Every structure is written in structure tokens, then in C-alpha cells.
Amino acid sequence: MLLRLLLPLLLLWSTSLSAQGFDSLMRTHGMVEVTQLAPHIRVELKYATRDNFIGENMYGALKKAYLHPNLARALARAQQALEAELPGYRFLIYDAARPQSVQRRMYQAVAGTPKKIYVAAPERGGRHNYGVAVDLTIIDDKGKPLDMGSPFDHFGEEAHLGNEEARVRAGIFSEAVPRNRALMRRLLGAEGLRPYDKEWWHYQERMPMSEVRKRYRLLAF
């Protein structure tokens, strides 16, 4: 009976934390809001919607993308280079810094399934949990995402980097996919970021995870 009475209060507390607290906690943990440095970058956080592999809104009302200042500045420079090369084109962020509590929920959702290889264990945290990884794509001057070969959060070989030309020959990819992925790698690579080979959308700083844990603060909330 007591638990039944407490459940609505716990739900209200959780909703309040995600709706109001995440923004404040991101800032107190040293993160910066990306569009303050790069106002032309678009943000559509997939984990603030049901359009993700879990099918739940895990961010509540959080709509802004936060990153460690180093990564945010690198992304801002990459956006400038993109616009100089292709006026009107922008990066579109799907996910950025991620609270450890959200990581736990994601990990629990894939536990015991083949998808678990794609989600970092929450105890020590992955790169998103330190604000040094970003999930993104490129949109054209009409706001349409470029063809990258698979949707965001696709758990399959189509999301993996490499063999793009072979997949074009096999009719799996359009001829635009290798060009679009190469554009991402070139622009972001020029700013010191590298991709994760199993997720075309995931870019991170070029340092081992052990060094990330030494230098940066875990988003332990």
C-alpha cells in the first residue's frame, strides 16, 4: 500500500529531475550548450523522444545538446568548415553528453541481447557519460539528412564503417553514401575527432578511455 502511494511521487520526482535538473547538472559538471558556440548546428535529441532503439523518452524535457568544451569547440569549427564548403549545410546532433542514470536504463534494456555490444556498461561510464562523444549527421540546405546508409541507432552491418563501395556495387547503398560518410570523416577528423567503426554517426576525441577517465568528470547523475 505504501509503495503504491509512493510510486506517483517517485515518478513526479524523476520527471522533475529530467525536465529541469539535467540542464543545470550538465552545467555544474562543466558541460557547455553546443548551440551557444555554434548556433547553426541543429539539435534533435533522439533520447528525448520515443524514436530510438528503446522506444522511450529517457531525457524528459531536455532538448539541448551539451558537450565538454573541448569537443564543443571542435564541433563549432567543423560546422564553420562545412558551411564554407557547402553553404546552408549543417550538422544535426542526435545525442551528446548523456547522464549516467540514462546509461543504466539503456544498458538494462539491451542486457542479454546481441545489442549489448553497442552500449557501454554504466558503472564506469562510456564516452557519452563524460561529454566527449557526439552522435550526429549532416543535413542539406533544405534540412534533409544526407543518405548515410542506415538510420541512426541501426544495430546492423549497414551502420558499420568500411566496405561502403562494395555495398554500392551490391545495390545495398546508394552512390551518395560513401561520399557523405567521407565528408563527415574529413570535416570532423580535421578537428581531431574520430569515428566509432560500428556507428557511422558516433564521433569522439582521439584518446584512450583510460585517459578520458583521468581527465574528465563522469556525469554521475
Which functions belong to the PLM regions below?
Residues Y203:
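Conserved metal-phosphate-binding beta-hairpin within the catalytic cores
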Residues P99:
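Segments that shape or occlude catalytic/ligand-binding pockets
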Residues S14-S16:
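N-terminal signal peptide c-region/cleavage motif recognized by signal peptidases
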Residues S18-A96, M106, G112-K198, R206-F221:
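Extracytoplasmic cell-surface/polysaccharide-interacting catalytic and binding patches
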Residues M1-P8:
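Sec-dependent signal peptide recognition
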Residues V102:
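Short, well-ordered surface patches within globular domains
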